[in-house]
Amino acid sequence: MAKEKFDRSKSHVNIGTIGHVDHGKTTLTAAIATVLSKHGGGEAQSYDSIDNAPEEKERGITINTSHIEYETETRHYAHVDCPGHADYVKNMITGAAQMDGAILVVSAADGPMPQTREHILLSRNVGVPYIVVFLNKMDMVDDEELLELVEMEVRDLLSEYDFPGDDVPVIAGSALKALEGDESYEEKILELMAAVDEYIPTPERDTDKPFMMPVEDVFSITGRGTVATGRVERGEVRVGDEVEIVGIKDETSKTTVTGVEMFRKLLDYAEAGDNIGALLRGVAREDIERGQVLAKPATITPHTKFKAEVYVLSKEEGGRHTPFFTNYRPQFYFRTTDVTGVVELPEGTEMVMPGDNVAMDVELIHPIAIEDGTRFSIREGGRTVGSGVVTEIVK
């Protein structure tokens, strides 16, 4: 069977369902797909087909995730749903499923619960920029005032974690009733998706961001100069562009790209996703090394101290068998290189067990080009023992 062509005329947005266990995330996911399929946007999905999420490996971590797609009139959505709480934690920290926005599902009958709070905090830390709220199971709540009370609680909770709680769209409905075909509740699903369409902006594409390429390898070509190779992570670079070499060394240096090659062919420019060799003017072979990045000037800076949200692999995932404490000194793997760093745990956290997630402070022995949202692995002797994301630059 010929593959269907991906329709690029609609803008593409990645979203997911978050919230406390049993509040109806998976049922809502099935309901959205099913209701939209009646309006010509994708395939209907059953609860079971989504709940039996396949196992995936991301940076050596086992994550169960369901990916489904559906369409509204203006957009194509890729939607991720996870069966277990631990899967959400891993997913959000590793960035296995990058979310441009999330639908927070809260049971109107129960109100916000511990994982509701934890998912909001995680969203804030790992950079999920927008949240829309679905108050589920409203058919189980007879009291209009109770519904209003739960809505207020959710708005306050969002504001507590720096989301605009007063402005966030909140839609009440019943995912189960909608999935069963009750028209008044199907209407609520369409209302929810209209809010998602309007409130969650279309993300900036990687190619529109400022240029950055992690350096994987360096070699010199006699008579031509030094070439740095790597995969362009974001933006685009043109022959003649000025770039900075950032990281490892304390000082950032500038150079000009005098040539761009891909598959031994010369190009005028390269963009996000391309594997290239960049010929650099006036750069000696020893002036640049793996682990640095080439970047558009003044867009990323080298740092040694940062705060991070980290998931520590369990023993079953090939992680550590024992806990670690403050002053733990593993390797932090950023993009293409390992750098030793020292961990400081938050006050009141004695130790971190395999399988935990934790906020920590890190100080690296060399500066690395990092910014909020930069992802990294924690390794010991080449074995991955953790995965993290930078939540704040300290120095």
UniProtKB/Swiss-Prot annotation:
Q: Which residue ranges does the record assign to the tr-type G domain?
A: 10-204
Mind listing the GO molecular function terms for this protein?
GTP binding; GTPase activity; translation elongation factor activity
Q: Which EC class, in a word?
A: hydrolase
Catalyzed reaction equations: GTP + H2O = GDP + phosphate + H(+)
Q: Which InterPro entries match?
A: EF-Tu_GTP-bd, EF-Tu_GTPase, EFTu-like_2, EFTU_2, G_TR_CS, P-loop_NTPase, Small_GTP-bd, T_Tr_GTP-bd_dom
Query: Region G5: start and end of each range?
Result: 174-176
This entry's Enzyme Commission designation comes to: 3.6.5.3
Assign the protein's first listed, main location to one coarse class.
Answer: cytoplasm
Residues where Mg(2+) binds: T26
Q: Is Magnesium tagged as a keyword?
A: yes
State what this protein does. Answer: GTP hydrolase that promotes the GTP-dependent binding of aminoacyl-tRNA to the A-site of ribosomes during protein biosynthesis.
Q: How does it assemble?
A: Monomer.
Q: What is this protein called?
A: Elongation factor Tu
Gene designation per UniProt: tuf
